[in-house]
């Protein structure tokens, strides 16, 4: 490709409304342009990257035995009513009526459509297992789209769905998809971690997320220093306390604490050990008999809302009680709450169950109890794992301790079980002629999200540093003063032909531009390899080669340059 015949829309200035580096660089490098909130057009360079990501995804899915199909983005509402998600999904589901007043949605996901398709097409166990995938545009009406294509309303996704008669074949397909996803991200040259994950709104049992590691990642990953164990912070298991509860050594005291509204203020003003304090959080209950529930964690720990949401006594989705409701029920506000004398179900974290002589709110404004002890001052409450893990704690496999990293979720695989097939009556006849509800798996990759995540992991102060496999072009040719030197023009043109003939994606900058502008554009758009041609190089019979990632330069003889560049891509 020649720059003179290409839409290379680079920008010097960083757009003011771009928050994260991938959004900034995709705009500056001329990869995307915003059409509306959360909606983007892909310009040529952006589309080239997107298509390369898509090609790798497709190749690995095909290798894993999945079969490609294509389903409509527009879906009939009656399928969503059938599974109950018409009411459950919320405003992210964009709904509309056609000219015949029939309800439709723009698909954020395709479980309903694929299950409907399979229940009509598959009738015998002999047709199973079956793994179908598509690469299709999705739409979620995010309340606040942000971060460019990282969290846009319209996005490109690969979603696969597998169908099984037994858990053995579901497990086999799940493992195949796990490996395929690992292969996809490895081939793209990205540092990543698969992690245990919560199944979220899609539901199911087993679930893993695939995270591209980046300091800007929204997700916190807890992983073991001594094994492959890794989990999203929402899913990471807290260790059970190894110590036993100590004997009471202090009397229960009611203390005035007028200026201590937070744990930090309480600890600072009274010289307390933060591990001897607790936080009490009031949430909505799941039953009329218990409309409010108290959740208690140690003062230095944080409540894990995903874990709390799964408690039987707690309403789902988790909802914190408003202050007015808390005051009406307890007589005190947040900052002064505690377990002593609290007339509602109490669930404590396991770490709280072994505490003694601890401090908590007294359920009276501006007062706390010091020296609280279980069984002496109140009954020991129900205990559960309801907190986030902490760095340095032992991991569940016993092979290391927790360390933390930030990641960007780009893939998610689920074992759905019968969540959708049962509600939609997707069944087949087994070998005995009996009707069996299909088991399902679901496997998603954010194709457009990978593009942004790759940039978040691969950039410097000059622009994008693309991994070889997904760069828009592999090689950039920079002829110095091309329009003033016939020698430079002739050699640049010949090199362009030779590299193109060798199957290398090459961009020839044939503009009448200053060298500084040409170099800046090549570095901004992130081309991995640059070849500079000038009269001095020609006199010496060499090209000047520069590596975008390392910055290293070297001279390469004319007759060796094609093989040299091909070897770099091998």
UniProtKB/Swiss-Prot annotation:
Its main location: cytoplasm. InterPro entries: aa-tRNA-synt_IIb, aa-tRNA-synth_II, aa-tRNA-synth_II/BPL/LPL, Anticodon-bd, Anticodon-bd_dom_sf, Pro-tRNA-ligase_IIa, Pro-tRNA-synth_IIa_bac-type, Pro-tRNA-Synthase_IIa_type1. It comes from the Bacteria. It catalyses: tRNA(Pro) + L-proline + ATP = L-prolyl-tRNA(Pro) + AMP + diphosphate. It is found in: Cytoplasm. The keyword Nucleotide-binding applies. Its EC number is 6.1.1.15. One of its GO terms (molecular function) is ATP binding. It holds the Pfam family tRNA-synt_2b. The keyword Cytoplasm applies. Keywords: Aminoacyl-tRNA synthetase, ATP-binding, Cytoplasm, Ligase, Nucleotide-binding, Protein biosynthesis. GO terms for cellular component: cytosol. One of its GO terms (biological process) is prolyl-tRNA aminoacylation. Catalyzes the attachment of proline to tRNA(Pro) in a two-step reaction: proline is first activated by ATP to form Pro-AMP and then transferred to the acceptor end of tRNA(Pro). As ProRS can inadvertently accommodate and process non-cognate amino acids such as alanine and cysteine, to avoid such errors it has two additional distinct editing activities against alanine. One activity is designated as 'pretransfer' editing and involves the tRNA(Pro)-independent hydrolysis of activated Ala-AMP. Belongs to the class-II aminoacyl-tRNA synthetase family. ProS type 1 subfamily. Consists of three domains: the N-terminal catalytic domain, the editing domain and the C-terminal anticodon-binding domain. NCBIfam families: PRK09194.1, proS_fam_II. Homodimer. This is Proline--tRNA ligase. The gene is proS.
